[in-house]
Amino acid sequence: MSVTFMLALARENSFTIVEDDCLGDLAFDGRPRQTLRGLDSGDTVLYLNSFSKSLVPWLRLGYLLVPGRFEKRLILAKFNADIASPALLQEMLALYLQRGLYAVHLERLVTQYASKRVCMAQAILCSKHLSLPYPEQAGGVFFWVQIPDAVLLWKRLRLQGVKLMPETVFSLTGSAQHFLRLSYVGCPLEQILEGIHCIDWEIDWLLEPKRRWKFS
């Protein structure tokens, strides 16, 4: 479905698109990004963004660009949830942005993440059992890999100190279990290679005779 068609469909049927762009600043190709909100001329997109992925996780500050019809209700909902965001943190972040420090930080961060992404992508492509079912994106913080039983492998890998997330965590029904989400941003390059090797080793173990796994 094209973006243009999606926006037209939203306008024709009077529904709202929620665009969560928390990883939008982490683009590695240097090209300007086009958001749905930027293309929207019919006030149909509610845009969300956050600094927790690109700055520091504990800085729970973000912002909304909302269609006018939702403004009062969202302000009331936020007030009922926490009354107000911390003013000092907001002032600090505003100053950080105004002085151009965020742009400098982001450039450095993107360079680091890009090298880690290349490292993990190459390790996955060279592994015995893993593959990338989706086209690589020039940004973000993780990969999805496909396997027969993500939950079983996840349980075994936890014992080896390999931290990842099975697809069931992101499923509304908990039934999806054939993908693992691998993040590359929180560890050095050598640990990325070690982690992929460990995943391959565990899959080898599960594929041995009398084990439960079978690759079709």
Protein language model regions, located:
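PLP-dependent class I/II
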Residues: M1-S216
